[in-house]
């Protein structure tokens, strides 16, 4: 109802026609970030697979199966990915370890960036000499969470494969990519607000990155929400409402969903072409 009441669909439709280049840019950024997520998973599998080379076919499988997140339960992409890669010779242990690491590190990257965004917002209400300690405190808290999660994973999932330099290297690459993924999401939101929706003074990219991370996380853990549809938009509108008016906040959330859906379809198509070319 909010979408229709605020005229968000009409605004987004007009924006696509008037600012096509902006939409092309943000969709390209999203596709790039999706491929980065797929590459990160390949590094995680490499990290927990002793003697295994870095396999590029994992990137293609990840990109193809990811489209299944739009089906009910929001878990079929994980199941499908595991099944396909298992048939391609990877062990259950490696796939389960990499899959768990992916979930933990994604949520930690999101939590860390959300904390940074919160500290940035808090800093606006603090004196200059208090801002740096507030931001550094958030950074240290995020690093502590990452370290704690790494230890937790090491102790609970097939201990030995995770206690290697390969696992550390794979996890380091992955969490760096995940941080970049959420940062690009913040950039996408900024471009949509500033260029497509034409908000005079949009929130800064640090804050938008934290909003994207928070909405993604809640959508991810919400049971049954296919690709977080509905949940992420609701959270994003609530977060943006504190910085912009309700109508542009709703329009931005709708535009962001459109960008991510089209981006997922394009990623799936590109991966499908790659897969066909390899046959």
Q: Which residues are covered by each model-predicted region?
A:
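Re-entrant/interfacial helical elements at transmembrane boundaries that shape
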Residues: 75-88, 224-241
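Mid-bilayer segments of alpha-helical transmembrane spans in multi-pass integral membrane proteins
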Residues: 66-75, 103-112
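Transmembrane alpha-helix interface/packing and boundary motifs in multi-pass membrane proteins
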Residues: 64-71, 213-229, 233
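A broadly conserved amphipathic alpha-helix scaffold signal in soluble, globular proteins
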Residues: 83-84, 97, 106-109, 113
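Predominantly cytoplasmic-facing regulatory/coupling regions of multi-pass membrane proteins
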Residues: 1-63, 110-112, 116-222, 239, ...
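Membrane-interface alpha-helices at helix entry/exit sites of multi-pass transporters
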Residues: 55-60, 74-79, 86-103, 244-255
């Amino acid at each position: 109802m909010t979408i229709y009441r605020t005229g968000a669909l009409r605004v987004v439709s007009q924006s696509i026609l008037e600012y096509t280049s902006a939409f092309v840019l943000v969709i390209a950024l999203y596709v790039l970030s999706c491929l980065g997520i797929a590459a990160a998973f390949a590094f995680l599998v490499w990290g927990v697979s002793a003697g295994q080379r870095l396999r590029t076919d994992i990137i293609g499988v990840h990109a193809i199966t990811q489209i299944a997140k739009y089906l009910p339960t929001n878990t079929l992409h994980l199941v499908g990915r595991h099944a396909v890669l298992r048939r391609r010779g990877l062990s259950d242990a490696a796939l389960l370890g990499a899959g768990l690491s992916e979930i933990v590190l994604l949520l930690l990257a999101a939590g860390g960036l959300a904390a940074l965004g919160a500290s940035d917002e808090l800093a606006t209400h603090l004196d200059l000499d208090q801002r740096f300690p507030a931001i550094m405190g958030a950074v240290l808290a995020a690093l502590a969470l990452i370290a704690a999660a790494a230890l937790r994973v090491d102790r609970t999932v097939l201990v030995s494969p995770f206690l290697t330099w390969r696992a550390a290297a794979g996890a380091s690459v992955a969490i760096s990519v995940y941080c970049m993924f959420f940062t690009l999401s913040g950039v996408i939101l900024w471009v949509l607000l500033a260029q497509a929706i034409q908000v005079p003074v949009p929130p800064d990219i640090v804050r938008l990155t934290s909003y994207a991370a928070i909405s993604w996380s809640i959508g991810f853990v919400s049971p049954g929400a296919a690709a977080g549809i509905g949940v992420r938009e609701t959270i994003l509108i609530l977060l943006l409402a504190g910085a912009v008016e309700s109508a542009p906040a709703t329009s931005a959330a709708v535009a962001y969903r459109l960008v991510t859906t089209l981006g997922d379809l394009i990623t799936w198509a590109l991966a499908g072409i790659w897969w066909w070319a390899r046959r």
